[in-house]
Each structure stands twice: as structure tokens, then as C-alpha cells.
Design a protein with these regions (language model features):
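ASCE RecA-like P-loop NTPase motor cores
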Residues: 1-303
């Protein structure tokens, strides 16, 4: 549940200043959670989506917690960075892939629906190229109650998406089939889903706890993403328009808030050096150009 706060007196001045070119406002003084309040209230006053950029993961997680409190968790998304790149031999953790893929899914849907999401990320996440929105949507499997789909074709599609057939669903990426019941643990979900079929028709969709098999809620529609973001990126990296900056998922009226710009710039240069020449990572100049079309607020505790 969102917590209602009295609007800061500076918000009117900030929103008026953002109406004038070059659509950038420097705000000096707020610290800690006050920065999140400024961002949330400015986005609300302007009725715009928000992209909040931080120097690092710890800062981003703190801002995410703040915004989830102020605006409601259902409106806020965290986009963590890969701890390893797609070109590395190691695979990223499922938790990071799940959060990244779910945020991309939500952004892809929000752009069509006009939903105003508040997205928080470290600068490292912005520098890492993502699957182009078009390709993510093309590879997304949508299933809803009342839909008719052949069970064999469904299983074939899930296998192509990288899911593994198991006797029982326990981990993300698992799928099991028992008669007219199909259990799927989507990579972007916290809990698996149970699809009950009558013939080829989906009669019900329920979330359930894998340990107890207890149902915890009904769903009308589920979107299932490819099991591996790494495989998706690798497959599309040589395709023209296969990868893009995350900013391409954002509406033109997005408000970008940069927390402590010097620290963000310093971290961006560190990432550049670490990934020099890697096609999965943009330079700061490229990233800056990608967000230049958005109105911006730069926050600093001291001048």
C-alpha cells in the first residue's frame, strides 16, 4: 500500500523549470530517502513514468524500497545489472535473470498500455544492452483462461523457450505435464503456475507453492518469457536491431532522475574500462545520448 506524503514545496518550482528547455533541473540538498520523495512527487505531479539512475546496486535497492513505500510496490520495478556478461562462460543467477526479465516484460506491456512505471537501476544496468522490445514480445508466450491450445504444441513451445520437462516443478524453468494439468515455473515469476485443461481449453490458472502444492491465488492471464536471457542475447547479438538500449522501452515523456551525477559518471567509466570493446555494453557517451531525449532531474546532497 502506498504511503501518502505532503507534497514538498519545491515540487512546483521543479515541474515549472522542467517545462523550459533544456528540460533539466539540478536539485541540491536532499539526502537519503528525501531524494526518493523528490523523484516520486515530481513524477506524480507531471503524471509521467520515472527512470531513477543510481551509481551502484546498494543505492538502487534503497531507492526501490523507498519508492515501493511511497507509490506502491505494484508500480515500481528494479532492474539489476548482470554480474557477468553474456560473453562470459559463467551464467548469471536465476534471481537476477528473473528480476531483469520481469522488469523488461512490465516495461514492454506498460508502453502499450500507457502505464506509468517507476523503474530504478544502477548505471551499470543502463550501460548493458538488452533484447530489443520487438523480439522480447515475439518470444513471449501468453496464456489465458478460456484459450484453446494443443498440449503437445504447448510443451513443444515451452521446450523451445528453454524450459525443461521434469516430474515435478521445483525451480524456475521447470515444466511438468500430468494428464490435463500442466505446471510451469516461469523464469520471471516468484511462484509456479498450474494450468488445468478441459480438452484443449485452459479452464483455470493458479499460482501454487512448490513445496506444499497449495494454491495461493487465481490468475486470468500469464506471460511466459524465454528461460535464458543469456541465450536470447547471444542469439540476437548479430541480428540488426536485435539488441538495444533499455531506454528504447521507455515512453518519450519519461522523467529521468540521476542521483549524484559525478558518482554515476565515475561508475560508468569503471564499467567502460572493464568491458572495453564488448558489444553488449555501451559507452557512457552512448548511454547519455540514449537518455538525452528525456526531461531530467539531477540530485545532489551538496553542490
Amino acid at each position: 500500500m502506498a504511503v501518502q506524503l505532503t507534497q514538498l514545496s519545491a515540487i512546483d518550482a521543479i515541474t515549472k523549470a522542467l517545462a523550459k528547455k533544456p528540460y533539466r533541473v539540478d536539485v541540491v540538498g536532499p539526502w537519503g530517502s528525501a531524494k526518493s520523495v523528490v523523484a516520486a512527487q515530481a513524477a506524480a505531479a507531471l503524471d509521467r513514468p520515472l527512470l531513477f539512475l543510481c551509481a551502484g546496486r546498494i543505492e538502487a535497492e534503497a531507492v526501490y524500497d523507498d519508492l515501493a513505500t511511497f507509490a506502491g510496490e505494484e508500480r515500481v520495478a528494479l532492474f539489476p545489472a548482470w554480474e557477468v556478461l553474456p560473453s562470459d562462460t559463467m551464467n548469471p543467477s536465476d534471481d537476477i535473470v528473473a528480476e531483469r526479465m520481469d522488469t523488461l516484460r512490465r516495461l514492454a506491456n506498460a508502453l502499450d498500455a500507457g502505464e506509468r512505471l517507476l523503474v530504478v537501476m544502477p548505471i551499470r544496468s543502463l550501460l548493458q544492452r538488452v533484447v530489443a522490445r520487438k523480439h522480447l514480445i515475439d518470444d513471449m508466450l501468453s496464456l489465458e483462461v478460456g484459450q484453446e491450445i494443443d498440449l503437445d504444441l504447448l510443451l513443444e513451445r515451452l521446450i523451445k523457450l528453454g524450459y525443461t520437462r521434469e516430474v515435478m516443478v521445483e525451480n524456475r524453468g521447470d515444466v511438468s505435464v500430468r494428464g490435463g494439468i500442466v505446471d510451469i515455473f516461469p523464469i520471471s515469476a516468484e511462484l509456479p503456475c498450474r494450468f488445468e485443461f478441459f480438452g484443449d481449453e485452459i479452464e483455470s490458472i493458479r499460482r501454487f507453492e512448490p513445496e506444499t502444492q497449495r494454491s495461493v491465488g487465481d490468475e486470468k492471464r500469464i506471460q511466459i518469457l524465454p528461460r535464458s536471457e543469456k541465450s536470447l542475447l547471444t542469439r540476437l547479438e548479430s541480428k540488426e536491431g536485435g539488441l538495444e538500449a533499455l531506454s528504447a522501452y521507455l515512453p518519450d515523456n519519461t522523467l529521468v532522475v540521476i542521483d549524484e551525477p559525478p558518482a554515476v559518471l565515475e561508475e560508468a567509466h569503471i564499467v567502460e574500462k572493464q568491458a572495453s570493446g564488448n558489444k553488449h555494453v555501451m559507452t557512457w557517451v552512448e548511454a547519455e545520448a540514449a537518455i538525452d531525449r528525456f526531461a531530467q532531474i539531477h540530485l545532489a546532497q551538496v553542490a
